[in-house]
């Protein structure tokens, strides 16, 4: 499924859209792409 992960880095909030099996994997993929980020939210995209 496609998942929108909202991330926060250095005072900026941005979205990372990833394909993953579940929310946990989506979070891991987004953090692997942006290692210094904090996850704000994880939402499915239809």
Describe each model-derived feature in a short phrase.
Residues 16-18:
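Generic detection of short hydrophobic beta-strand segments and adjacent strand-loop junctions
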Residues 32-46:
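Short, mixed-charge low-complexity intrinsically disordered segments
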Residues 1-14:
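Short aromatic-glycine-(Arg/Gly/Cys) micro-motifs in beta-strand/loop hairpins
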Residues 14, 23, 44-45:
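Intrinsic disorder/low-complexity segments
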């Amino acid at each position: 499924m496609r998942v929108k992960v909202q991330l926060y880095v250095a005072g900026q909030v941005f979205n990372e859209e990833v394909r993953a099996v579940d929310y946990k994997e989506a979070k891991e993929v987004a953090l692997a792409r942006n290692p210094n980020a904090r996850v704000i939210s994880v939402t499915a995209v239809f």
